[in-house]
From Swiss-Prot:
The keyword Hydrolase does not apply. It is a single-pass membrane protein. It comes from Human cytomegalovirus (strain Merlin) (HHV-5). The chain crosses the membrane at residues 15-37. Belongs to the HHV-5 US34A protein family. This is Uncharacterized protein US34A. Keywords: Host membrane, Membrane, Transmembrane, Transmembrane helix.
Length: 64
């Protein structure tokens, strides 16, 4: 049984991924990463702007 498995492993050659396929995969991963960074930045900016508006409103109330 073990010999059979060893023979199978020897016969299987390493999987060769064509260069253009690898390139496409890298491009997809890169675009996903960029989108995620953009989303994070947008959310951060939105939170920052909301905080600024709250502070302005608070200032307006305290100084009529």
């Amino acid at each position: 049984m073990l010999k059979f498995f060893l023979k199978l492993r020897k016969r299987r050659r390493p999987v060769v991924v064509p260069r253009f396929v690898r390139f496409i995969v890298y491009v997809v991963l890169f675009t996903v990463a960029v989108q995620r960074v953009k989303q994070e930045r947008d959310a951060h900016l939105r939170r920052y702007e909301e905080r600024l508006q709250k502070n302005r409103a608070r200032r307006r109330q305290s100084f009529p």
